[in-house]
């Protein structure tokens, strides 16, 4: 059983929602990435999404785009991202680790090579933003063979037939994008999200995590009440961007603590 599945099952028993923070590998520098990942875990992360820097991240808003740009300036690419994940795994064997990225860098190094590298780094799941389910069959099959979860995005505009198709391919969890725009966009309509999550669950037994637009503890708490996981990305990346170097770890720690307290309080 995958670490992702085990984590969600344990949290379900406790009536809790997973906190899933996102950071971009190599931002603000490669030397900071593993320390940041450890800080996330020490302050309540149930699993981590690690972004692969890419020059054209179409689903990402300005905050994460700039993080990608900074990482690329630091010469951090897909292989470096996997190496950083592997470094993290040297001291943390338990926390599920998910790579999030785009098809282009994966195809540039070759799918087989990518899967071989992430297996060696003990990656637990992959989100490939621009791999539609219709074209993902072989990729998903290869990941399944290595017991790596394939995580797909669903949006407010995803129709029921497509939800069914994605549900057949996906494993680990389903990632519901709460807004029609890019990451870090405007406010979430929590009632609409609740309705859509309920609809998704008609077609899949997988946990549903919600992301895009979770900007403060109040929103994190509201989202945790209606989902199995809360993805916090742009807000953390913004904290990294706006903090002086010596303040990054303390500020991320403080932010994580406030988000975790809010998420856990929803089950009280």
Predicted regions located by residue number:
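Active-site-adjacent beta->alpha loops and helix N-cap segments on the catalytic face
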Residues: 1-11, 54-66, 76-86, 106-112, ...
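Hydrophobic faces of well-ordered beta-strands that scaffold small-molecule active sites
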Residues: 19-23, 48-50, 97-101, 126-128, ...
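Conserved, mostly hydrophobic/aromatic
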Residues: 21, 40, 51, 118, ...
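Glycine-rich beta-to-alpha transition loops that act as phosphate-gripper elements at the mouths
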Residues: 24-29, 100-108, 132-133, 154-158, ...
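Catalytic cores of alpha/beta
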Residues: 30-40, 158-168, 210, 214-230
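Glycine-rich phosphate-binding active-site loops on the catalytic face of alpha/beta enzymes
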Residues: 45-56, 125-127, 176-184, 213-214, ...
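Alpha-helix-loop-beta-strand connector modules within alpha/beta enzyme cores
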Residues: 62-98, 141-155, 191-208, 251-268
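Alpha/beta catalytic cores of nucleotide-metabolism and tRNA/nucleoside-modifying enzymes
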Residues: 198-206, 215-221, 225, 230-268
